[in-house]
Amino acid sequence: QEWDSPLVHYGGPSDSDRPSSVYGKAASHIKLRIDGIKGASSKYFWRDKSRKAPHNAYTDLEKVLEAYDYTPEMRDPFQFSSDISYTGQMVDTIYLPFESGKDSFVTYTYNSATDKFERAMDGKEFIDAATDKPVEVQNIIVQYADTYVLYNDVKGRKMVDVKGEGKAEFFIGGKHLTGTWEKTEYEEATKFYLEDGQELTLKPGNTWIHLHPDDEEIRVEYRES
């Protein structure tokens, strides 16, 4: 809701009477939906047969933009500055754990030459299918949120509550910062703040937000100064 954008996805739970349903009451606010399972596959999605299904489906965001049947409101929820420089410990690697296994991690390793974080999964480089190069991220936000398994859901589906407030961690320019997040209404933008109360400023570039259970910790390794 806070982005006023279409929901682009490839299937999902569709039991209309369950809170997890991508077509249920919780999704009633969606203005435009593009679902690769239900008819949108041929126009907006394709599969890379050299990669293992089901995680080999891709889309073209320029084509998605052509699908708008309404005029979206231009929103700019983040502050950016190419001159921003934070003090703090220099990060080497960020470890974000999965519940599927104790040794299963998404990692981001800081590359000082590019000033970006390179993504890997379980120790293997996460390669961009379009460029055949490791995925690089300029800014990383870890947003801790209340996460719980839905009652009586045999598949263990989870709900993440993104309304309210909580702690957050930021990784910008190789530095590790801590702070908070706040979202007063579902349609309002999520605001991120540093420990001193100042609103977060990011470096120009792509920004990835990881929603993380608020009762679990991430691990960070630092470089020697």
Residue ranges with predicted function:
Residues Q1-S225:
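A surface/extracellular/periplasmic glyco- and lipid-processing/surface-interacting theme
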